[in-house]
């Protein structure tokens, strides 16, 4: 009985969400098809209920007594890193729902299934974060991927959305096959799937035969390539720009922040814990991905004319910084990677809050901005929005004293401790180059001339509040930067074991 309670206790938030998903599904099916009620639209109701469910799940997680143990026959882990990451996921999801709520009303996404899929995707992300076994890792990632394929193609009347979902499905299925094949190779050669057991096994790597070492290296490479694909790291980034562009904007925001944190947490467990004895090997792969990600993300962003493709390439560049922090393989690198992800997520929430609120009014209808040229002379239409976006872009570029500067600084300091001077100089140079396309956008807002005047649609109060909150966080983090630094360091302590 005690073992059963220890298994149930760490996943109480997931059980709570799944039970509510079943209730919402029954509620949606019964009421949306009711003739007496006139076939009501339930999307707004389910959106508010989803927000309440996630709020209650965060409270359940936050007030749980912390237990540093594994559960479900060591399939899941509940350490300090997992505990804090789950809290961050719930806060991000709440912010995402509040930011995108007005967009869903504007775009008339009236299907109640939308919110059920979002809740299931969040559960899948939570399972990925807690995974402590190759089997649960694969099943959780597949659970997440199947939902993401549907969400990417949710706009059935849009050719771009259908293309995005199909392309994501084909390439995602290929990467899942690599993950499964790599896991089966490792299990076939070792008979182990648990992360901690694999870490103990690989301490005797020098005693293995050459054929076994080649097989294990091949299996590990396939797993690493699959996870880098899910993280949209170059040269495995081909799907990201098209999927970001074709998906609904709210889903694009979801793709750009939620899976990043989940896959990063999984990478940290695999590279730092299970396969730490392969460090000389996986450092080469990670280093190649860093160079390609930062170079392709930076240079490709120059030629983009659409917002979502621009953000896709910008996020690929930031993935390079995630991996750069992992490259050091020490506690400072883990801490700086967590710090960088937190700053990145808050910045992306702020930028998408701007994109979702920037709607232009044309007689009898209003439309959302899609092109970067819509920013021309924005300072004349709405100076407050122009200043807000300027600060967010400066933060993405790493201009002091904004949050993005400290995030990049901590990553570079962790890399310099390992005396990796060459990659550090390369990253600094590419960061300087990336400043040009951010400054180019700022120039168009303040100094470019406009051919015709545009009328901005009134900004939603909730979106303006969230935009202001994220802006204050990014702008004034230097006043109490130790708070986030302590949090990220505390989360990294679980890897000391």
UniProtKB/Swiss-Prot annotation:
Which GO molecular function annotation, any one, does this entry have? NADH dehydrogenase (ubiquinone) activity
Its biological purpose is as follows:
Core subunit of the mitochondrial membrane respiratory chain NADH dehydrogenase (Complex I) that is believed to belong to the minimal assembly required for catalysis. Complex I functions in the transfer of electrons from NADH to the respiratory chain. The immediate electron acceptor for the enzyme is believed to be ubiquinone.
Q: Name the gene behind this protein.
A: ND2
Catalytically driven reaction(s): a ubiquinone + NADH + 5 H(+)(in) = a ubiquinol + NAD(+) + 4 H(+)(out)
Task: Give a GO biological-process term.
Answer: ATP synthesis coupled electron transport
**GO annotations of cellular component type:** mitochondrial inner membrane
Q: How does it sit in the membrane?
A: Multi-pass membrane protein
What species does this protein belong to?
Answer: Chondrus crispus (Carrageen Irish moss)
Where found in the cell? Mitochondrion inner membrane
Family of the protein in this entry: Belongs to the complex I subunit 2 family.
Keywords (alphabetical) are:
Electron transport, Membrane, Mitochondrion, Mitochondrion inner membrane, NAD, Respiratory chain, Translocase, Transmembrane, Transmembrane helix, Transport, Ubiquinone
Q: Give the EC number.
A: 7.1.1.2
Q: Which PANTHER family match?
A: NADH DEHYDROGENASE
Main subcellular localisation: mitochondrion
Q: What is this protein called?
A: NADH-ubiquinone oxidoreductase chain 2
Write out the transmembrane intervals. 11-31, 40-60, 87-107, 109-129, 134-154, 169-189, 213-233, 253-273, 278-298, 310-330, 338-358, 386-406, 422-442, 466-486
